[in-house]
Amino acid sequence: LGFTGTYEGRPISVMGSGMGMPSIGIYSYELFKFYDVDNIIRIGSAGSYTADAKLFDTVLATGAVSESNYARVQSGNDHDITFPSEELNDKLRASAKKQGIKLIEGNIHSSDVFYRQPSDAKPTYWELLRDERGCLCVEMESFALFANAEVLGKNAACLLTISDSFVSPEITTAEQRQKSFTDMMKVALGAEY
């Protein structure tokens, strides 16, 4: 489902991308390649890997680390990290600053698995991603989005709101996720691109 219109006089489209890298991979590739879209800003929820990223905080991704083989299969990129457009991230930073919205910046983890089986290994998988790769939180799409943007010479970015945490028992309710995750939207809509 998608909507196209204007926001403060600028054309904008808002749509769902489905869940996971294959889904956003298809949508973003087609929008970039066949519909001449230049900028895609993913917004969504994430689970925090660190006490520094608390419920309702807004995260700006500076890299997406993944165990996915999406980029390797799609374009031969063997790296386990993809990057957003620095130009678009700069515009998001400026928008946040103008609106007084705090951004937490860093790498994120793009996982193929929502329900990973528990392990007795210490440190845990997510602790390794946090401690060795600087991942602040986990989501499921940005690695593929950034890979497509790089291959096609387009711009992509990701803003996330922390909905739950691996280091705290706190969790947002469904109603809070529907009604309170607005800072990331304000930052995305306020960017001048």
Regions inferred by a protein language model and the residue ranges of each:
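Active-site rim beta-loop-alpha module in soluble metabolic enzymes
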Residues: 79-132
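Generic non-transmembrane alpha-helical segments
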Residues: 91-99, 148, 187-193
